Amino acid sequence: MSRWKLGLDGFVTHFMVSGPQEEPYFNEAKDKNQLRYEAYLRSVIAEHKPVGETGEILVGEKSRLNEEWKYYYDSGSCFVNISTFYSVMRRIHFDIATMLETSSDIDVTAALWSYAAVDVYCNGRLEGALKQPVYKPIQKKELTLHLKAGRNLIYLACENLGVRDTRSVAGLQILNHKDEIKVSIPDEACADAAAVAEAFLESARLESNKLCFDSSAPAGTSYTYRYHEEDFAKAKIPAVWYQAEGKNEILLENGQPYVTVKVVLGKLELKRVFERTEQLVPKYALREDGSAFSFEENKELIFRRIADVMSESRGEKFGFPISNILARKHFNDNSMDDERLMYEMLEMIEERYDCSDFLMCGLIRYLHNYPVEGAMKERIKDVMINYRYWMDMDGFDGMCFWSENHALMFYTCAMNAGEMYPDEYFPRAKMTGRELHLYGRNKVLQWLDDVEEYGFEEFLSTVYMCVTFAALINVVDYSEPEISKRAAAVTDKMLSMLALHTYKTGIVAPMGRVYRSVLYPFDQGAMALMNLINPKLPYTFGEGWLGFYASSHYPIPEGLVKLMEDDVETNYTTGNARVYLEKNDDYCLTSVASPREPFTRWENETLKEDVDITTHNFTKSFNERFHGTTYFRPGTYGYQQHMWYAALDGEASIFVTHPGSTSEEGDMRPGYWHGNGVMPALKQQHGLLGGIYVIPDEHPIGYTHLYCPECRFDEVIHEENWIFLRKETGYLALWCSEKLEAHNGMNFNCEQRAYSKNAAYLCVCGGKKSDVSFATFKKRAKETSPSYDKESKTLTAQEFELSYAACKDVTQFL
């Protein structure tokens, strides 16, 4: 029977998993403070029922949860991670089982890591527990496992509250006796098959147009190019799988950036996803002669692309169709069953799916522009009157109200819905339409006041700026003139910031919130906005948010293309952040200061007693707790903040993060590439950026990693602790205090890791204009003579100096 060694840093990496078991969850408790309310729900959701007899734990058989046991495989991961997004609230159970084998009786110290509530059993004995789930940061519990000679069943019973992005994650780290322990799985008959399938998948190498393996593919091996569909109608179509049994290489089609390889051996199924970085390229909409379309022509092309998608996919379960319907109405396009889609959408709004405010905002735009009669009119009225427009109104759901984009969505929806039905009574709000209109109007004004004074918290987010754009143009189009004018000015500011950070073919920017698209500046959602402004740029679908613009009178401001194209070296503030940007013909370097110069951050009101929870200031404070702070300081727990980039264009970019997850599976914030588990110290000056990453013992991931897609550069040189990069006339150099080691996960030849909890990086930028040649640049970069003192945590490079002093931010514990 196959056995495995412990993984990186002593983590157990081979498990069987049952679940998640998902049940509708309802709690009669009420609290107008949603922060306190969800904390309460997490405190009571875990039942901690004794596991009792587990029975035989076999792949394909049912567990005590009445869910099948599966062998868990996630290439490179140190955790079981079955995180996902829940649009409605759920009670979650999942069980994890593994076998630890030893030749003698030993007491082993282990660390349990999880966001869930977890009971840990060793041979049926409860050894320790995490009592309740948390949102963030991850919990750690040290415990003793009393192992007997032979096989020891380790059983983790996990419980969680499923609400929005839910971290169903657990890991077990062995802290001593590591060399005396081997790992297996309870299903002895499946262990050998699992080892064969896993060894085959782990041997994979992406080489040009083929995927190569060290051995022939086992029976039951197949592959597909299917990964993600923007159109929910297409997402429902089964993937096409191609047989690969007996092959030791798979020839891959051009234009297919994703390939998933699956091995099925009996009831055992393992998958690994590969991303072919070089196959992900900018998409242009140009005339046959290569010239750009006019603004008006390009705008129509944008609307056509959105109209051709039936419904924007929100995963495998449902789609959001309103942007697509709005685009089709622009063309008077009746080719799809939009009446059915509208009724399905109204049901989602009525059930108050998370993000149903997006649908409501689009519905309001629809009603302002297109007539509705009969049963549809009455159905819409009923849904709108009975909607929950804010978290202190009656109702139980898992909607996110408080992020910068969601808050404005809800505020403007309340303002507009109340105005549409002034004499109707809105029972959840306990207001008439006139009262709800004034309520929403007041909140919109508070939101505008805040952004005008402080700037955006979700600054430069290439995901959420698209959402905020849609909400803002609703305010522009459907508000009284003074409010409309202010909303237009804020929209102008948002687009100006994005234009300022548009470099050659992509948006290169630090961001308040980001997702995995951070790897591809040319393919980020907000490039849809930049392509609208400048048709010469690559386009993206941008989740179809520009469907709202098809019926808007908001004018794009002048001068944005010039902002994109001009050289600049500047810094500015937004939220609590100070952003640095330097861009020229050769390179772009941008970051947030961490820490920034002494200043007074805005006060988080959730930390105060007897605070007025009805104000937008409280909502903004609430958002900082959930979605991460813009008060960047070393040692602070991160969320979705992206802190720096160096780029030679929208494809050839690099950055370093401390990952929040050890693999790309599961819906994690922070993730493997987006966000940071713990924030570094950062300092930028002309052509130079230094970073110090110190990982505390309270965080389970003990390395940092560099994203460096070598296929995007014309020349790549590895030399001791340096990597030198050239593309056309631009040059980058990256130094690390640790020896960098290549790692291939979902992408190949894109990642370098520093296996240290205390490491420094120096990025040097240059180009032909300042350095004449690449060789001259290399010499100049080396002459900075970077040095890092681990004890004092100080990085020096000629006149450059940066020190690390760890900070703790109480707002980031939830």
What are these regions (language model features)?
Residues 1-75, 155-197:
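Accessory carbohydrate-binding/adhesion or oligomerization-edge regions at the termini
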Residues 81-84, 95-97, 138-143, 199, ...:
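Short structured motifs
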Residues 83-93, 131-135:
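Extracellular beta-rich ligand/substrate-recognition surface
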Residues 90-92, 96-108, 144-149, 203-204, ...:
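Extracellular and analogous surface-interaction loops
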Residues 102, 106-120, 154:
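Aromatic-lined ligand-binding clefts that engage carbohydrates, nucleic acids, or primary amines
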Residues 119-171:
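Beta-strand-rich ligand-recognition modules
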Residues 192-405, 437-444, 536-814:
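Ser/Thr/Asn(+Pro)-rich, low-complexity disordered segments
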Residues 357-578:
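Extracellular polysaccharide-recognition and catalytic grooves
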